[in-house]
Each structure stands twice: as C-alpha cells, then as structure tokens.
Amino acid sequence: MFNTLYPYGYMHTMNTIVRTTIFDEWLSHLKDVNGKAHIIKRIRSAERGNFGDRTALGQRVSEMRIHAGPGYRIYFMRIEATVYLLLCGGRKRGQQADILRAKQLARIYKEE
C-alpha cells in the first residue's frame, strides 16, 4: 500500500546554510525570544528549500523578511548550488544600512 507513496527516484535535497560570525553575533544578541524563534524557524525552512518572503537586492544578495517583531530581515547569498551564506541580520528601521553592509560582506566573500 505505501510502496507507491513517492515516485521511484524521488530525492529531496537539503540546502546547507552557513552563517557568518556577524550574523551569529546579531542573532545571539537579540533579546526578543519570540522574534528569535521565528528567525530560527525561517532558517530551518530555508534548509528545506522554502525561503518564503524574499527579495533579490542585486550583487547576489537577497533578503528574507520575517513577519515578527520589528520586521526582522536576514540578508544572504547563494554560494553554491545548495549552499547559502547568511551575511547579516537587521530590522526594518535599519534596512538601508543593513543592505549596504550585506553587499559589502558579499564583495569581501567573493574576493576571498
């Protein structure tokens, strides 16, 4: 009965999410426990291929919007087929500065 649940050859690929120390420091300093939980849940979804509400910002940088707290953002870039680098995080209020920072971090990563 359950032998035909998935077609033969079905394979689910997980994404690998790599975090910069800048991103880790930002996340660890968040005092909003509920917001932090939403961010971690969103990262887990991205590992399974569901990035949700995201926008390409140019220079290979994209933004994931988290609909919790003060409008958290995660800035990331794709570095391999299924590998993504979380560059930094921020809030809606500091969005423009965070975007510039993420693009700068992406340039530094590309140069290495």
List each language-model region with its residue ranges.
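Enriched for short, Lys/Arg-rich terminal
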Residues: 1-17, 25, 36, 51, ...
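A short, surface-exposed loop/turn module that caps and links secondary-structure elements
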Residues: 41-68
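Surface-exposed, Lys/Arg-rich phosphate-binding patches that contact polyanionic backbones
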Residues: 28-29
